[in-house]
Swiss-Prot record:
Role, per record: Catalyzes the synthesis of GMP from XMP.
The keyword Phosphoprotein is assigned to this record: no
Name of the protein described by the UniProt record: GMP synthase [glutamine-hydrolyzing]
GO molecular function, one term: GMP synthase activity
Taxonomic source organism: Ralstonia nicotianae (strain ATCC BAA-1114 / GMI1000) (Ralstonia solanacearum)
Gene field: guaA
Domain Glutamine amidotransferase type-1: 12-210
Signal peptide segment: none
Catalytic activity: XMP + L-glutamine + ATP + H2O = GMP + L-glutamate + AMP + diphosphate + 2 H(+)
Assembly and oligomerization: Homodimer.
Length: 547
């Protein structure tokens, strides 16, 4: 079912993307206010904008320059609809130019933290401030990222905010509901950013906060039943959050018309295969076909050391194994995938040349055409946090729904260099010990005093306080001593990060006692490993995964 028809019952916000790296964060903030929104390229047609029928429109930032990129404009329908419009950074420039103002290159570029002074009284910034100056001026702590600046506001606009180097850092035409800010309210660095966006969406635009996951189940189930009818569906079940929630939702809708295919490529976490089977066969009573293809995958990975080559091999072999199994299910007419909204956005970005590939993503793209199947993607409108919320509402256990992210190629990209069964077995056990200790260790008041956590985090497990944690197998040996003998065994690295969006991440400051206990257990319980190191790299410059 087209997205527009499924969500016509909700008030919607349209976000037009000019190529910013943080446009997704705008959508997440709007969704967190329980208002449905979608991201679309800035060059959509006027007809699309009118058909979307938004309650409000937000124009994103961009790396581009307004006066150099004349094609980066909002459709005319944006200004003709009569709904509130918020321009952010480049979106402010687009609004300025299209409404008759002027934008020029700034002699002083601003990248990073800044303090913005609010001017006058506007609905958007009324009572929203971080502190006041001795003179009584309301101030906001914000994040700036721009090289141009507005030098002349369009007719009808008034000054809303400024900095010493950016005299027009915010402007408003309140009669038409047009607002623009030079800073980025969507990023966490802008302290009052969430309040600003909620003010715009809920109060100025009057959107109803009715985007609730438990209510979405009923809508999604109805949509799936209408799409599928009495036809059968197959789904590649990986054990990850997305495919698990997709399977649970589809099974809720059509029951035994769904067959899940679980491919074990030999690179799963410890006991992961059995856990998936117990959940979907035992608890949900879903049909699951278990395929052990570990020999095939590991065989094709022999001698391969390049990370990108490993990803492509694992993706190719998954397609072949899944395709062979799918052909035995002759009644299947649909292929279901756990595609989520960031995947959709990034694919669109790639098509418009607004995204750059850092690593190949392991998925089953291409299967629908190869198999002649129709594609069913029930999660394609949802962000990861919404998928987790939906999973809990569907009855999946929290320990499955809130598991840390696991790459599609599995341990294949957590074993540096060549992948061997021996390495995978060692890594599986080391990783399980690390995760077990993280789950079993709670943050203490002493940890809070030491600055390792906040007071409100005391009592939570360190697994829940980290966004992603795992072990990495290093294909090098080091000398050690155990008992009276010399050892010459492998090394594993532990990686744990904390992040809100996975675009940037800080390495997790875990208690030394916890790290020491993990190291001691791995060295004593996993024969073949005699050294454990901890990764203290942030993102950037490092990525979260090592490969």
């Amino acid at each position: 079912m087209p997205i527009l028809s499924l969500h016509n019952m909700h008030d919607k916000v349209l976000i037009l993307d000019f190529g910013s790296q943080v446009t997704q964060l705008i959508a997440r903030r709007v969704r967190e206010a329980h208002v449905y929104c979608e991201i679309h390229p800035n060059d959509v047609s006027d007809a699309f904008v009118r058909e979307f029928a938004p309650k409000a429109i937000i124009l994103s930032g961009s790396h581009a320059s307004t006066y150099e990129d004349q094609d980066l404009r909002a459709p005319q329908a944006v200004w003709d609809l009569g709904v509130p419009v918020l321009g952010i950074c480049y979106g402010m420039f687009a609004m300025t130019v299209q409404q008759g103002g002027k934008v020029e290159a700034s002699a002083h570029r601003e990248f990073g933290y800044a303090e913005v002074r609010a001017h006058g009284h506007t609905r958007l910034l009324d009572s929203i401030e971080d502190f006041r100056t001795p003179e009584g001026h309301g101030m906001l702590k914000v994040w700036m990222s721009h090289g141009d600046k507005v030098t002349e506001m369009p007719p009808g606009f008034k000054l809303m905010a400024s900095t010493p180097s950016c005299p027009i850092a915010g402007m408003a035409d309140e009669a038409r509901g047009y607002y623009a800010v030079q800073f980025h309210p969507e990023v966490t660095h802008t302290v009052q950013g969430r309040a600003l966006l909620e003010r715009f969406v809920l109060e100025i635009a009057g959107a109803k906060p009715d985007w609730i996951m438990r209510d979405h189940i009923e809508e999604a189930v109805k949509s799936i039943r209408e799409q599928v009818g009495d036809e059968e569906v197959i789904l590649g079940l990986s054990g990850g959050v997305d495919s698990s929630v997709a399977a649970a939702l589809i099974h809720r809708a059509i029951g035994d018309q769904l067959t899940c295919v679980f491919v074990d490529h030999g690179l799963l976490r410890l006991n992961e295969g059995q856990m998936v089977l117990d959940m979907f066969e035992g608890r949900l009573h879903a049909k699951v076909v278990h395929v052990d293809a570990s020999e095939q995958f590991l065989g094709h990975l022999t001698g391969v050391t390049d990370p990108e080559a490993k990803r492509k091999i694992i993706g190719r072999e998954f397609v072949e194994v899944f395709q062979a199994e799918a052909k035995t299910l002759t009644n299947a007419k649909w292929l279901a995938q756990g595609t989520i909204y960031p995947d959709v956005i990034e694919s669109g970005g790639a098509k418009t040349k607004k995204a750059t590939t850092i690593k190949s993503h392991h998925n089953v793209g291409g299967l629908p055409e190869t198999l002649g199947l129709k594609l069913l993607e029930p999660l394609r409108d949802l962000f990861k946090d919404e998928v987790r919320e939906l999973g809990v509402a569907l009855g999946l256990p929290p320990e499955m729904v809130y598991r840390h992210p696991f790459p599609g190629p599995g341990l294949g990209v957590r074993i540096l260099g060549e992948v061997k069964r021996e390495y995978a077995d060692l890594l599986r056990r080391a990783d399980a010990i690390f995760i077990e200790e993280l789950r079993g260790t709670k943050a203490t008041a002493q940890d809070a005093v030491a600055g390792l956590c906040t007071e409100d985090q005391v009592g939570k497990s360190w697994y829940d306080l980290t966004s992603q944690a795992f072990a990495v197998f290093l294909p090098v040996k080091s000398v050690g001593v155990m008992g009276d003998g010399r050892t010459y065994d492998y090394v594993v690295a532990l990686r744990a990060v904390q992040t809100t969006d996975f675009m940037t991440a800080h390495w997790a400051h875990l208690p030394y006692a916890l790290l020491g206990r993990v190291s001691n257990r791995i060295i004593n319980e996993v024969r073949g490993i005699n050294r454990v190191v901890y990764d203290v790299s942030g993102k950037p410059p490092a990525t979260i995964e090592w490969e």
